[in-house]
């Protein structure tokens, strides 16, 4: 028989995370590595755990993630959104709680493109009066 699992996709900046929630005892695997091993920072670990802590689902699910692109902060944000969306599929009653906390909103902020004639997105070359 097929195992029950809930899927969620999260994106943030250039990062894309595919998250699977499987009924279990709260194990975290990100790209086949543990949470602390993958991120190495307590703050990023906290960001990833937020939806589970808010909904009191920490010991109910094993979290399996595949994430690629971007940096560590973007990846943590993408995983958080993926977990929140997967939790929603597991229990639709969690929607108001997750929505109020802002975990179901995709953060639209991304790197602004560089413009020609400038050194970066907005940084202009040094101006000399004389």
Curated annotation (Swiss-Prot):
NCBIfam families: PRK00132.1
Protein known as: Small ribosomal subunit protein uS9
Gene Ontology cellular component annotations, sorted alphabetically: cytosolic small ribosomal subunit
Name of the gene encoding the protein in the UniProt record: rpsI
Keyword Transmembrane: no
Annotated stretches, region: Disordered: 109-130
Basic residues: compositionally biased ranges: 111-130
UniProt KW keywords: Ribonucleoprotein, Ribosomal protein
InterPro entries: Ribosomal_Su5_D2-typ_SF, Ribosomal_uS9, Ribosomal_uS9_bac/plastid, Ribosomal_uS9_CS, Ribsml_uS5_D2-typ_fold_subgr
């Amino acid at each position: 028989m097929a195992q029950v699992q809930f899927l969620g996709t999260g994106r943030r900046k250039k990062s894309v995370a595919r998250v699977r929630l499987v009924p279990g005892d709260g194990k975290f695997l990100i790209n086949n590595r543990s949470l602390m091993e993958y991120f190495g920072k307590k703050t990023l670990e906290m960001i990833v755990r937020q939806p589970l802590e808010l909904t009191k689902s920490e010991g109910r699910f094993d979290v399996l993630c595949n994430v690629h692109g971007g940096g560590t902060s973007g990846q943590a944000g993408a995983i958080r959104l993926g977990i929140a969306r997967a939790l929603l599929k597991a229990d639709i009653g969690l929607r108001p709680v997750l929505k109020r906390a802002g975990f179901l909103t995709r953060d639209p902020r991304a790197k602004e493109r560089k413009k020609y004639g400038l050194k970066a997105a907005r940084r202009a070359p040094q101006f000399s009066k004389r």
